[in-house]
Amino acid sequence: MKVANGYEYTAIMEKIAPKKLAMEGDPIGLQVGDLSRKVRKIMFTLDVLEEVVDEAIEKKVDLIIAHHPFLYRPTQHIDTTTKQGKMIKKLIKHDITVFAAHTNLDIAQGGVNNILADLLHLQNTTMIEETYSEPYCKIAVYVPENELESVRLALVNNGAGQIGTEYTECTFHTTGIGSFKPGANANPTIGEKDALTSVPEVKIEAIFPQYLTETITKAVKIAHPYEEPAIDVYTLEMQTYKEGLGRVGMLPKKLGMVSFIDKLKTAFAIDNVRFIGDLKTTVHKVAIIGGDGNKFIHQAKSTGADVFITGDVYYHTGHDLLAINLPTIDAGHNIEKVMKGYLKNKMEEQAKILDYEAEFIVSEVNTDPFQFC
C-alpha cells in the first residue's frame, strides 16, 4: 500500500466536493500547512478550534479536513498571543495541514444538504436554488471483452454513469470488431508489429459532468490494457449537469408539526430547536438548507414546502418568515456536523480503491458554542 501525500487526498476531495461548486468568495481549500507532506492520519471536523487542534496533536493527525474555513476573512497579521494565533502556531509547529470544503460540500451531490435530507428520509429531492450548471459529456471506450470490468470500474469509481440522484453505475455496452496495425516502434498488448490485427471488443459508454473529463480519461487510460486506447469524449447538447444549494423533498407520510420536530431532533441528535409559525401545520413537503439559510427564504417558499429547516435565523428574518407564511425550524448551524462521518466513509472508500494506507478519524470535540439553559 502507498502512503499518499496531501495533494493526493485533496484530489479525492475534489471528486467529492469540486472547488468549482463553491459560492463566490468562499475561501475553500488549503488553510495552513504543506500538502506535499505524507499523510498517515486524517481527521474530519466541522470547525477548526484550538481544542480541535489539541485533539489532532494528541492523536498525531497529519491532515485536518474541515467544513468551515477558520481563515474566512483576510488576515493582515497573526498574533500568536491570541487564541487563533496560538492555534495557527500549534498547527505549524506540529506539521498539521488544514484543508476546508465549505459551500462546495454544501452544494455537491451527496454533500451536507443531501445527508440532512436523507436523515429525514425525504424522497424525490431536488435543489432549492441552482448555483452551477455545465454540459454533460459522454465517454465511449473500446476495450477487449476480457478487460471490460476493469475499465467499467475505472469509469464508475471516478464519477461516470450517474443519472439523476438515484441511479449510479449506468453504462451501455455494444460488441464489435476492433482492428489496428501496430507500428514498428509499438509495444502491442495484442497482435504483432506491422500486421493488421482484428479483435472482438466491447464499446462501453457512460455520461459524466464535463468537469470530470480529465479525471475519468486518466483513470481509463490507467485501467486499459492498450498503450494507446481508443477513447471518444463528446459534449451532450440536450443534457445539463446542475447543482445547487439546499434540498426539498417529500416525507414518506404526512406528519403534524410537533411530531415532525420530534423526528428531526432524533435524526439530527439535538435536544432543542427554535420554531417560527403555526405548530398546528401538517408537514409533507420539506425544504432544508444546512447552516445559514437566511438569504434563501423566498426560494424555499417558492418550492411549496410546508416547512423550512435551516440555522442561524435572524430576528428580523423571523418576522419576514411570518409575513410570507413559511413555518421554519431553526435547528442550529451545528447540525452540519453530519459531514464528519460522511467524509470519513467516502475517503476510506476512495483510499481503498487507490490502495492508500492511512487512518481516518472524526473529531470528538463538540464545537457548538451554544448551550440551552
Curated annotation (Swiss-Prot):
Pfam family, one: DUF34_NIF3
Keywords tagged on the record: Metal-binding
GO cellular component: cytoplasm
Binding site for a divalent metal cation 2: H68, H333, E336
Highest taxon of the lineage: Bacteria
GO molecular function per UniProt: metal ion binding
InterPro entries, alphabetized: DUF34/NIF3 (IPR002678), DUF34/NIF3_bac (IPR017221), DUF34/NIF3_sf (IPR036069), N-reg_PII/ATP_PRibTrfase_C (IPR015867)
Family, similarity comment: Belongs to the GTP cyclohydrolase I type 2/NIF3 family.
NCBIfam families: YbgI_SA1388 (TIGR00486)
Name listed for the protein in its UniProt record: GTP cyclohydrolase 1 type 2 homolog
Species for this entry: Listeria monocytogenes serovar 1/2a (strain ATCC BAA-679 / EGD-e)
